[in-house]
């Protein structure tokens, strides 16, 4: 059953269609149009030909062609409290049979936070969604949403309300959200601010700043979602962005000066350790809230990957293979363990691909995929998956990884990739049950025991992979 979400915002109308009501279902349509809905609402007669109606008509046409059975439409600050909002709703209902739900500011903040949680499973900190008509703030921790606040600090409203001063904006954020956040979280305000762990930037205006930052620093990956920036580095960049008129980036002319003001104000008030950009926000939150409870509790990365490769959990025994590799990993954390699972799943994604090009294909896919991997996961997966198809890891990815992830992750990625190759050589492509075990001797040697004696050719391949694992561990020890 295909479902669609429409988000009517201050500056744009967005729509997305999902294949079904599972968390791992892929998007099969995603588009947006600029919207001057304020101009429409200011007309004497709302029943005129207008781009807003043409956009909605187009979406309805696409929904019909895709056999969409359920449409959820929400409108935010652009209609919230507007005297002609009800008249507009009635026209849209009559013309397109779409029911527009005009959500409150707090509801918008909640749904934005829910969307963030669906896309970043371990999100912790403050979600900030900046639109044309408002700024929504939400506290997030342990997949739960805490304090919610909607402030009249949208990029289009700041100038109209004469709020275009960093001190005014900072004071408003602190008074309306910061003080409540301090009381609720137990984090006491110091002279500088509150020191929240992460500040998640959502909304087109803030994402554009993130994209511009990536270009400015020549960030090697292209994925905006889950981009992590040190607070101090981001502060310095915002200063350059605000004052350096000669700065050359393709996004500079499109960045709203009020978005820079709001971003700087939030950094002043919350003092986050990191700034993280998220592509997941209101639309995703509306969908997430409509999903069954059991779907909401799942991990979107695992579910999206499972759907991609048509992974049958009853056929594979990933847990047992994970136990086999654990003794040879170097201080693995939960992310490292999750990489093992994802590599085994993605290693099945090789049908109808030239076997001599599988390594190139899978690396490029991981780097380009819209599955919401963290950048750390993308690099670890790329190294490990390249090794499952070739005897050497991808040179380009190796160079990136050495710059962007720590030595633990770099070495563990090599260990995982070579281990998966060993498992395939011994047990075949389906990881049903391990017929071998590994033991680390004196923290130097790796001993393998197999259920059956291996043919010489297979044994030699396994030994080469064990040597590669030993070399990765040796390099790590030398680095340390």
Pin down the residues of each PLM region.
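A short acidic Gly-Thr/Ser loop motif
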Residues: 7-12, 128-134, 202-205
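Short, surface-exposed alpha-helical segments at coil->helix boundaries
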Residues: 82-89, 260, 463
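Divalent metal-dependent phosphate-bond-processing catalytic cores, especially two-metal-ion Mg2+/Mn2+ enzymes
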Residues: 327-331, 399-480
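Helical "lid/coupling" subdomains associated with nucleotide-phosphate turnover
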Residues: 17, 38-62, 81-82, 99-118, ...
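A structural preference for short, hydrophobic beta-strand core positions in alpha/beta folds
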Residues: 73, 102, 277, 477-479
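N-terminal glycine/serine-rich phosphate-binding loop of ATP-dependent small-molecule kinases
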Residues: 1-4, 8-76, 85-99
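A structural motif specific to WD40 beta-propellers
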Residues: 28, 146-148
């Amino acid at each position: 059953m295909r479902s669609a979400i429409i988000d009517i915002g201050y500056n744009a109308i967005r729509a997305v269609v999902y294949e079904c009501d599972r968390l791992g279902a892929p998007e099969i349509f995603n588009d947006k149009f600029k919207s001057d809905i304020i101009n429409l609402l200011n007309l004497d007669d709302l029943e005129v030909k207008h781009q807003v109606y043409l956009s909605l008509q187009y979406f309805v046409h696409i929904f019909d062609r895709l056999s969409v059975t359920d449409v959820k439409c929400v409108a935010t600050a652009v209609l919230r409290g507007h005297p002609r909002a009800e008249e507009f709703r009635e026209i849209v209902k009559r013309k397109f049979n779409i029911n527009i739900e005009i959500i409150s500011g707090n509801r918008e903040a909640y749904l934005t936070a829910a969307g963030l949680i669906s896309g970043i499973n371990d999100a912790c900190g403050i979600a900030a969604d900046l639109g044309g008509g408002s700024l929504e703030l939400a506290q997030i921790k342990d997949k739960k949403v805490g304090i919610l606040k909607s402030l009249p600090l949208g990029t289009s409203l700041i100038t109209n309300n004469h709020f275009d001063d960093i001190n005014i904006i900072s004071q408003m954020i602190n008074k309306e959200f910061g003080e409540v956040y301090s009381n609720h979280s137990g984090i006491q305000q110091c002279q500088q601010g509150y020191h929240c762990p992460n500040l998640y930037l959502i909304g087109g205006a803030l994402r554009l700043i993130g994209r511009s930052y990536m270009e400015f620093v020549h960030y090697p990956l292209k994925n905006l979602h889950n981009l992590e920036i040190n607070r101090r580095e981001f502060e310095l960049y915002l200063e350059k962005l605000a004052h350096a008129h000669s700065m050359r980036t393709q996004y500079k002319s499109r960045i709203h000066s009020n978005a820079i003001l709001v971003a700087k104000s939030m950094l002043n008030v919350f003092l986050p350790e990191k700034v993280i950009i998220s592509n997941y926000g209101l639309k995703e939150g509306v969908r997430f809230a409509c999903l069954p409870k059991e779907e909401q509790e799942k991990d979107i990365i695992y579910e999206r990957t499972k759907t991609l490769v048509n992974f049958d959990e009853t056929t594979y025994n990933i847990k047992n293979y994970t136990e086999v590799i654990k003794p040879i990993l170097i201080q693995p954390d939960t992310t490292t363990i999750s990489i093992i699972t994802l590599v085994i799943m993605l290693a099945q994604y090789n049908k109808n691909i030239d076997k001599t090009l599988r390594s190139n294909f899978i690396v490029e896919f991981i780097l380009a995929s819209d599955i919401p991997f963290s950048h750390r996961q993308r690099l670890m997966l790329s190294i490990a998956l390249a090794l499952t198809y070739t005897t050497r890891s991808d040179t380009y990815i190796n160079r990136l990884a050495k710059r962007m992830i720590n030595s633990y992750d770099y070495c563990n990625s090599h260990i995982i990739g070579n281990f998966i190759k060993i498992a395939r050589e011994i047990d075949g492509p389906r990881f049903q049950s391990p017929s071998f075990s590994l033991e680390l001797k004196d923290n130097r040697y790796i001993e393998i025991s197999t259920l059956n004696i291996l043919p010489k050719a297979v044994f030699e391949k396994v030994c080469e992979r064990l040597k590669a694992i030993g070399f990765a561990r040796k390099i790590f020890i030398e680095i340390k």
